[in-house]
Amino acid sequence: MIALIQRVTRASVTVEDEVTGEIGPGLLVLLGVEKDDDEQKANRLCERVLGYRIFSDADGKMNLNVQQAGGSVLVVSQFTLAADTDRGMRPGFSKGAAPDRAEALYDYFVERCRQQEMNTQTGRFAADMQVSLVNDGPVTFWLQV
């Protein structure tokens, strides 16, 4: 399971001219689900995403996680993160989970975030989405479990 996380001052996702999720300061989480992923990996990745200390403390040091910084989380499914880009000029998607399994694990990940009392907004699974963000820093990390 893969999370591309970006520290943002604001982010939103729109589907068919409807805003489905919007946050102020916090994390935009682009989530990719691979074939061998399961609930255990989703739990671990959620723990890492919410615990990752990439927000500045009073001394300007990256020492706070999103909850400590008072931020929110916007989770957007992105199957292209599971692409095989090792060769050729076209990505392959054989590493990605089947859509029904990927959606179940995406929903599970979102619910785990909410269970941590995290303000968690979402996109719409498998939809054509427009994602807007202001990357703060820029600060972007690839987390994989």
Swiss-Prot record:
Q: What does the entry list under GO cellular component?
A: cytoplasm
> In which compartments does the protein localize?
Cytoplasm
The GO terms describing molecular function are: D-tyrosyl-tRNA(Tyr) deacylase activity; Gly-tRNA(Ala) deacylase activity; Ser(Gly)-tRNA(Ala) hydrolase activity; tRNA binding
GO terms of biological process kind: D-amino acid catabolic process
Q: Which key words tag this protein in UniProt?
A: Cytoplasm, Hydrolase, RNA-binding, tRNA-binding
List the InterPro entries hit by this protein, alphabetically.
Daa-tRNA_deacyls_DTD (IPR003732), DTD-like_sf (IPR023509)
What reactions does this protein catalyze? glycyl-tRNA(Ala) + H2O = tRNA(Ala) + glycine + H(+); a D-aminoacyl-tRNA + H2O = a tRNA + a D-alpha-amino acid + H(+)
Tell me which EC number(s) this protein carries. Answer: 3.1.1.96
Principal cellular location given in the protein's record: cytoplasm
Is Aminoacyl-tRNA synthetase found in the keyword set? no
Q: Spell out the family assignment given in the record's similarity comment.
A: Belongs to the DTD family.
| HAMAP family assigned to the protein according to its UniProt record, in alphabetical order | Deacylase_Dtd
Domain topic, free-text comment = A Gly-cisPro motif from one monomer fits into the active site of the other monomer to allow specific chiral rejection of L-amino acids.
Quote the function comment for this protein: An aminoacyl-tRNA editing enzyme that deacylates mischarged D-aminoacyl-tRNAs. Also deacylates mischarged glycyl-tRNA(Ala), protecting cells against glycine mischarging by AlaRS. Acts via tRNA-based rather than protein-based catalysis; rejects L-amino acids rather than detecting D-amino acids in the active site. By recycling D-aminoacyl-tRNA to D-amino acids and free tRNA molecules, this enzyme counteracts the toxicity associated with the formation of D-aminoacyl-tRNA entities in vivo and helps enforce protein L-homochirality.
Subunit: Homodimer.
Protein name per its UniProtKB record: D-aminoacyl-tRNA deacylase
- Species annotation: Enterobacter sp. (strain 638)
